[in-house]
């Protein structure tokens, strides 16, 4: 059926058609090869923006460092990072004046968090730079390795399990003259197989000890590993992102906790809320500006874009902000929060894998690791790479580049938002002292500025003043990429506002489709995505019905589970036809067993098993929901699971979906090839860690506990919890005396074993 696309838009107001212009269908671009070039770009650009600053040398690591703070005031419109300390402090003071008590209260909230956060908070997150192995690892493994090394070097504060104690260890580790670390390596040897008498290669994993002196350790502790950001749409060039190591992460977490607490209290902040809550917050600011400008004033809005936000921010400025925000707070608290910006002022950027060379004539490939870039002859490189390397050479130490100015992407989103809002806050009439005034919205580096004035000259003057005020704190509004409109039409964080927010449905397109977890989860996630978009994103009933039909079709092709009475032949069709024929109530078969689809837009909230339960043959029910079915390795049954869905913008979102455990909720087994590699020891550590955490969660279901505070270990906490629960269950008659006695005995045994250890 041919559709003339223009017909689709006859009834649609033009602003709703914004969706069709977004680059969100199809696969996003991924990066291949090394990120070294992108990282060098970042380092060189950052230094260029701050080039008129003062050069110093770090006494501990010998790294050359550039400090642009209080540098020359800009004379042109080029981006620059010369923030003025007194201007930043004054902006903070005015922010506090217009929000009395905001800093004080946020500090109190943060102090409570600091005292209660457990070190396992650092296991959240994906890849983390593991300084012991000098490469990226899953967060939990990197943390376990760090704690293991600390312990073997006599640092034991972290055993209490509080994050703050782990951070004490980090501080102490930096004073040590040397650290002993364990690295994994692989040995291969040829042995004869007893059974087949053939020679086979046997791999063994070894751990070897290695001593690292203070300077090398500091460099590793201050290193951010870099990667290329994947799946970025609408860009021609890729860019580098950073992943910090465990020494930095905890400190950053506390700073961001404080900043988040402040952002929650600021009406102009687009963080940390999201979705509909964010839209409501933003609509309020717009409403305020429009109501005040009805008769006499003009109101204009800038859809703003900042040039290289991260590369012009400066950790020293963040230190000044924190010093101001935490004034009058206890000394220990101020110290803990100052460490993150200080570490960032001394950070090192790891250049990644290096370059790959291949000779077409000799069919040779060779890797030039980043460590060699300092000394290699540049004649092998092309013009642009040669320039990059020449520029970065003075900054190189052991394959990392000293990068004092600038903040790598995504590290201090909340705190930089506070800085942005403090400039928006200066737009009140009592501060501008003229006829123009401004307000706006800020979310990390994205902003919208609303300026009101009696006439066009006033608007122009207001924008100019805002622009210049931003320059004073190292924020560079891009005159090329920002545009101005009558208030009522603007874009902010990919929300399009036209007398109210317009649903930008194309953003959600990537999350439609089959996720590929397993048959049960995929069905549930698929219909939940459609349901959520009907609620939040103006997905109309007709389109939703069509999306549902397309999803079912996609699902059937993915799992080769076409209806039992279909003509389509697949590997599964023989089995599914047989099942179809011997089933009395065919409507009861799940779609993944070749059954019909009973979903429509009214019942998307019901899990498929529940929807069809009454229609199922009894023996089918028995097979489907039988935990003893030998073909299924079962997850524990939780009524609500979390799926990771990929919206087009921003990070992957976690989305809840109802999960009914059936024989279709299988978990694919881990690929065995990993078991023969040097990763094996790491894998075992990780599984061990996982088991401990799961066990702990069993004792303290997250709904019922605030993380235990104090110095008891996980084991002690679990034992005492078991005793309490057992006593309650025994006294209420839920368990017998014998069972109670047995539990008590087990608890004592565990304590005894711990004492012997």
From Swiss-Prot:
A single cellular component GO annotation: host cell cytoplasm
Keywords: Eukaryotic host gene expression shutoff by virus, Eukaryotic host transcription shutoff by virus, Host cytoplasm, Host gene expression shutoff by virus, Host nucleus, Host-virus interaction, Inhibition of host RNA polymerase II by virus, Nucleotide-binding, Nucleotidyltransferase, Phosphoprotein, RNA-directed RNA polymerase, Transferase, Viral RNA replication, Viral transcription
Alphabetized GO MF terms: nucleotide binding; RNA binding; RNA-directed RNA polymerase activity
Biased composition (Polar residues): 55-64
Description of post-translational modifications: Phosphorylated by host PRKCA.
Residue numbers covered by motif Nuclear localization signal: 187-195, 203-216
Subunit structure: Influenza RNA polymerase is composed of three subunits: PB1, PB2 and PA. Interacts (via N-terminus) with PA (via C-terminus). Interacts (via C-terminus) with PB2 (via N-terminus); this interaction is essential for transcription initiation.
UniProt family annotation: Belongs to the influenza viruses polymerase PB1 family.
Protein name: RNA-directed RNA polymerase catalytic subunit
Gene: PB1
